[in-house]
Amino acid sequence: MANFKGHALPGTFFLLFGLWWSIKCPFRQILRRKERQVGDRERQKLTALFNRIDLIEGSLKIFFAFVGIMAEQFVPDGPHAHLYQDGWVKLMNWQHSTMYLFYGISGIADVLSVSSHHVPVGLDRLFLSLALFVEGFLFYFHIHNREPLDQHIHSLLLFAVFGGSASTMMEVFKRENAVLELLRCTLAILQGTWFYQIGFVLYPLSGPEWDLTRHDNIMFITMCFCWHLAVALLIVGICYCGVFWTSKWCERRQRGDMEMGLRKSTSTDSSSQKALLQESDEE
């Protein structure tokens, strides 16, 4: 959709997944460390928990992709599933629908990776990397013959898209790497906020319209992209620290409850021993 809503919709999807990954990835790293300290039964419970989370995530990805395709195709000015009718019909909407299609395929790969043992390890990351590559490939040929600022602001998005595709592809070969996972989180959030920025620049909700040919605006937008990256890094850092400190607090509380229980049992044992000694003295 060539309007603000058309950019806010994918921006919201990427923001939600980026924020979710920023919480899930450090949480998963902490639980992985605990796996080495627990028995087989607890390890099986953690594996089942991870699989359930991944299954829900894949299902949500499929749902969001379906919503995106329906929104692109069946808005009032959309193509309504007509590709050619005396000429090409709304090719921009078709390109966006194709982008959502590959994210839906990525969601299917997520579900299959969890529900079937015959699926190769890393297939979920491979298809996510492919979906990101297709998005960047489509957007690269999406911006020709446009005003300079329009081309520039979309080309900046490609850094986040292709960067995310490359880092996710590396996860196929270096599974459960903390740095690569956090990089994926950062670039997903950057994509989400930058989609909103594109919408505000090209389709401002209020105030004067941007001059799409002025070089100063191009310079500002380039600097603004760096600010978005800094904010994305800050958000991921806050989420990581929040999960880490919450885990530490829960561990301290659990340890305190165990110590209190031990003290109670010790005091109960000592009081019962005293009672037995008193009874024996009386006898």
Curated annotation (Swiss-Prot):
- Gene Ontology CC: one annotated term: membrane
A Pfam family that this protein carries is: DUF716
Q: Where are the transmembrane segments?
A: 7-27, 55-75, 99-119, 121-141, 153-173, 187-207, 218-238
- Polar residues bias: where? 264-275
Q: What is its main location?
A: membrane
Membrane association type: Multi-pass membrane protein
Which InterPro entries does this UniProt record tie to the protein? DUF716, TMEM45
Positions of the UniProt region annotated as Disordered: 261-283
Q: Which of UniProt's keywords are assigned here?
A: Membrane, Transmembrane, Transmembrane helix
In which family does this protein belong, per the annotation?
Belongs to the TMEM45 family.
Which protein are we looking at?
Transmembrane protein 45B
Q: What gene, per UniProt, encodes this protein?
A: tmem45b
